[in-house]
Amino acid sequence: MKKKILFISPTGTLDNGAEISIVNLMEYLVQTGHQVINAIPDYHVAVQQDYISSLAALAIETIALPSVKWWWEDAPGGLPGSPESRARSYQENTSALRKILTERKIDLVITNTVNMFQGAVAAACEDVPHFWLIHEFPDGEFGYYKEKLDFISDYSQKIFAVRGALQRQLQELLSNRKVLSFAPFTKIHPTNTGEKDRAERRIVSVGRLTERKNQLELVKAYNQLSQPKPALVFIGAWDEEYKKQCDTYISEHQVKNISFLGHKDNPWAEVTAADLAVFPSAMETFGLVYIEAIMNGLPTILSDNPGHLSAYEIFEEGQLYSSGNIEELADKINLALANFEGLKDQSVANLGKIQERYTVQSVYQTLLDKIENTEMYKANSLRHVKCLLDTNLPSQQASSFLRKVKNKLLSGRRG
């Protein structure tokens, strides 16, 4: 049975993996006959209009709701406005979502990322099944949601987490629930990287230069490589303060042959078949850039952070090193450079297997199965008091007794 599905999206932009992944899922659902509506916060920025137009071209309707803050109060993003204005905004957003559910006869609500709760509450009020897709580890900037897992459990018929380390961690924290899995998906069109014999060997790392991406670790390992060593190339924009840290280390240790290319619309067009890809991230939710590298047939070395491990468990391609162990990383790079031709041939030979494992259908199979079977879910008891969440109730005048008390107090002050 085909369904009307309402997605609650975190930003209404295509500059993050969670949004990119879910748009691909929404597109697939439309192609298979479902009707998809997408709710986003309206921040009145041009990039959101591009996002809305892109989704409209895929037959996905987007509804932008004015919002003081779309995410939980203690989620990243600060505290814009006053406590009263945020509370009112949450109420109005929840009310607007409830109206969409009833007027559009929505069959299922899916909240994409842990950071929004309005869709879960609206679904509970209107007796509509709700699925929650969690991309974030409950640590660091997203550690705030660990104490909200009871709410997440109470207001979700099904909970999904990125497969691997995150799924296992949440399963331990939600021992009374079955946490299901998915993997983020991005469309990858392998780039023609040219013949490997026509380009110089290089070490490349694609991605924004940030403390979390941890490229300084690669710079330090590069400084320890055996001579002669190939060029090290970073492709991606950067955070200014972190770039200064890298520049300072390079200058103080007189490290040569490192270049920073900055942002490129198609970073993989800068890569050649003679390149070795290295990703030293300290933390990732999922290793999308690692997947892009192996789907371009590049020999790859990656740190063993939980997000990388989650992706590695699917493909088992490339070489892992212990995050933070600079000596081990240097050894892995030296060995990979010495055996590059064999690693390259192996990477190219495995491309067919990798492409078969990474499709929308395969990474979202469990979710797709559950979407087809939402009829048996138990209603949430919040529906019995949903009138308390209405925002269109008329303001009540104070009773005559209360007015007399107020007047008495005021006259006492004047006396």
Language-model segments: residues:
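Short hydrophobic beta-strand element within catalytic cores of glycosyltransferases
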Residues: 299-303
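A conserved mid-protein helix/loop that constitutes part of the nucleotide-sugar donor-binding site
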Residues: 19-24, 201-204, 208-224, 241, ...
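Nucleotide-activated donor-binding/catalytic signature segment of Leloir-type glycosyltransferases, i.e.
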Residues: 244-262
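Conserved acidic donor-binding segment of nucleotide-sugar-dependent glycosyltransferases
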Residues: 315-327, 335-340
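Donor nucleotide-sugar binding/catalytic pocket of nucleotide-sugar-dependent glycosyltransferases
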Residues: 63, 154-191
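Short glycine/serine-rich donor-binding loops of glycosyltransferases
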Residues: 267-268, 287-290, 308-309
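Aromatic "clamp/platform" in nucleotide-sugar-dependent glycosyltransferases that forms part
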Residues: 263, 282
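Glycosyltransferase donor-sugar binding loop
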Residues: 39-47, 206, 231-244, 260
